[in-house]
Amino acid sequence: QSGPRGWLRFTVPYSIGIAWISPLLGAFHAQYPELRLDMHMSNDPVDLIGSEIDVALRVGTLPDSTLVARRLAGFRTQVFGSPDYISRHGEPLHPDELQHHRILAVRKHYHSHPSRITWPLTDGNGGTADFPINPLMVANDPSALLGAVLHGEGLTLATDVAAKPYVEEGALRRVLAGWTGPEVDFNAVFPRGRVMSPKVRAFVDFLVERLSSNADYMMVHCPSRCPMEAAAAAQLQAGEEVREGKRILEEVVG
């Protein structure tokens, strides 16, 4: 029985197409050799109803009510830098120190206040705060900053999946263990009411599997908490459970 065939036309933002999707297309084609791919890269919304595009891959919320989304993955953002930068400028141990470092920032990842620019970061206990940064460069697309970060120009807040290949080869290191930035939702978007074709379903299911695998890899190699913090938190929780057990026992006995 033959599988999906023909042309699959999809649109994706530039940086995501380059960093997230292109590395996966060889494996997808090996799995579905009868499918041909037409990738339209654009940072602008594409008219899915009036065009021949089968599916759009988009980041963030879905403001258009004529469209429906299937969530492909959710990616953490964390602070990364090159070993060269860290050896020359040191490693921040707390987000308060970021204002004294060279920062390369993506506009959608920071908050702009009247008198300062901040990164919203969450600690391992779920508490979120805005920490001042003094970016030497900002861009609307993370791929514009990645080359500079890899060459030791500064620190950046990036998604796990974008950083993964460079973490694997040792070109990037995560800093500020225990702190994460906003989570990025990645969705497959279709016109409401359109039946999903076999070729689109195959592509979407493939992306869910592969992107989840990448996210799982980074959860292991760059956990939200460093091992010492996680062990301390587990010990604290265990102590609280013991105390609660003693309290209940005392109430029963008393």
Regions found by a protein language model. Name each.
Residues R9-T11, A56, L104, T156, ...:
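Short, well-ordered beta-strand segments
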Residues Y14-S15, P83-D84, S143, V161-A162:
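Alpha-helix/helix-capping structural signal
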Residues R5-V68, V220-S224, E241, R247-G254:
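Central regulatory/effector-binding core of bacterial HTH transcription factors
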Residues E34, D160-P165, E169, W179-G254:
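C-terminal effector-binding regulatory domain of bacterial HTH transcription factors
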Residues Q31, L35-A139:
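Acidic, Gly/Pro-rich loop/turn segments at junctions of secondary structure
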Residues R70, D96, L146-G147, R201:
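Alpha-helical segments flanking ligand/cofactor-binding loops in enzyme cores
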Residues A69-L72, E169-G181:
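Short beta-strand->loop
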Residues L146-A171:
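A ligand-binding cleft/hinge motif common to bilobed small-molecule-binding domains
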